[in-house]
Amino acid sequence: MTRVLITGFAPFGGERVNPSWQAASLVAAEPPAGLAVTAAELPCVFGESLDALRDAIRADNPDLVLCLGQAGGRPGVTVERVGINVDDARIPDNAGGQPIDEPVVPDGPAAYFSTLPVKACVAAMREAGVPAAVSNTAGTFVCNHVAYGLGHLIATEFPHLRGGFAHVPWAPEQVPDGTAPALPPATVAHGLRALLAAAARTPAEQDLKVTEGATH
């Protein structure tokens, strides 16, 4: 049975909830067939988030890791193609830290690509009826910090792992006036189950050869 670690973040930026953790918890409570899923909540703090991720990987010894974060304003689940080696925080993290133009890992490579089949994951979510897309930027806040940091952990400490990052939209309770896109965490979790099933059966090098690019 494939062992999966799925992570979400604590609320940040004045929010009372974080839909990434809500969805991760739902997936762990009702995992896809053939997968053993454990969920871990990461602090929305530079540095500490990667320490918590490393500890969770060591504790659970997963085969596959999916880290989640909140991307308010995006209309669907977006699977990140790449994490880049820069922290450039527009707002402080939950500990008050606000690094500007600092590397996630000093002297690390410029970027790490996801080792999940990002296009197959997107296709699986769409087939499950959940809006999804490939994203080419995870931002430069703690989400990208973890997306890049996970790639570095895989490259340097856990070479048996495959892993990647996905962003989820706001939950409806975060936009009660309906002025921005939102998805219920249960809907997101339904899509993530399809994503994980696709990731477990599809090596990254056998990803779908379909267009999911962007012109800008």
Swiss-Prot record:
It catalyses: Release of an N-terminal pyroglutamyl group from a polypeptide, the second amino acid generally not being Pro. This is Pyrrolidone-carboxylate peptidase. Homotetramer. Removes 5-oxoproline from various penultimate amino acid residues except L-proline. The gene is pcp. It is an enzyme of class 3 (hydrolase). Belongs to the peptidase C15 family. Pfam families: Peptidase_C15. The active site is at E80, C143, H167. InterPro entries: Peptidase_C15, Peptidase_C15-like, Peptidase_C15-like_sf, PGP-I_bact-type, PGPEP1_Cys_AS, PGPEP1_Glu_AS. GO terms for cellular component: cytosol. Its main location: cytoplasm. GO terms for molecular function: pyroglutamyl-peptidase activity. CDD domains: Peptidase_C15. Keywords: Cytoplasm, Hydrolase, Protease, Thiol protease. SUPFAM superfamilies: Pyrrolidone carboxyl peptidase (pyroglutamate aminopeptidase) (SSF53182). GO terms for biological process: proteolysis. It is found in: Cytoplasm. Its EC number is 3.4.19.3.
